[in-house]
């Protein structure tokens, strides 16, 4: 397969073509090759999704070009989810650090949290929240952001997962509101 031009747009299309030919599986943040390639290219080049399309046609440096090609090839050869390659996943409109110590956040619960579980829950009456099996802490942190008056307990059996959740509570400045607890289900609660 020939190398692409040195623009983000060309790199995205080249990556998507490589992903399709490799038969990659998606579902950890994206659901198709083009979105997955765009996510990796834009992340590597630090291009925000809110940038005008014209930035996609500007040539990148040799160094950045090589970095992008390496990451796209790594996605094909390792078959690891893009979130693990970028150390980042989005949940409920918020970025989270992730690595292989936790599952990649992907849940329809994000939409419920963003809507404060309306119409089933009165947000003013929520004072405490428990997230069991917190992993990266994404559900607990998104709940803390949505229910600002609530105390949130986030429990997990895995110390490794709690270490990742700790990174995320600090990233979102919620150390004082989200308590991380090592617990096998309810054993330490």
Give a label for each model feature.
Residues 2-91:
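N-terminal auxiliary segments of SAM/dcSAM-dependent transferases
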Residues 29-31, 122-125, 175:
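Short helix-terminating capping/connector loops at secondary-structure junctions
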Residues 56, 66-148, 152-167, 182, ...:
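SAM-dependent Rossmann-like transferase core, predominantly class I methyltransferases
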Residues 173-185:
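Conserved SAM-binding strand-loop segment of SAM-dependent methyltransferases
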């Amino acid at each position: 397969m020939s190398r692409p031009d040195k623009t983000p747009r060309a790199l995205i299309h080249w990556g998507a073509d490589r992903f399709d030919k490799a038969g990659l599986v998606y579902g950890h943040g994206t659901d198709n090759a083009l979105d997955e390639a765009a996510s990796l290219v834009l992340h590597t080049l630090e291009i925000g999704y809110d940038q005008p399309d014209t930035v996609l046609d500007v040539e990148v440096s040799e160094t950045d070009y090589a970095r992008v090609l390496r990451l796209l090839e790594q996605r094909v050869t390792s078959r690891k989810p893009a979130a693990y390659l970028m150390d980042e996943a989005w949940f409920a409109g918020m970025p989270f650090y992730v690595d292989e110590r936790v599952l990649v956040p992907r849940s329809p619960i994000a939409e419920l949290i963003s809507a404060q579980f309306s119409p089933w829950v009165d947000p003013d009456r929520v004072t405490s929240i428990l997230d069991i099996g917190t992993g990266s802490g994404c559900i607990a942190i998104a709940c803390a952001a949505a229910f600002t008056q609530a105390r949130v307990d986030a429990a997990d059996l895995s110390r490794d997962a709690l270490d990742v959740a700790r990174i995320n509570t600090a990233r979102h400045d919620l150390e004082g509101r989200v308590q991380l607890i090592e617990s096998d289900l309810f054993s330490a609660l």
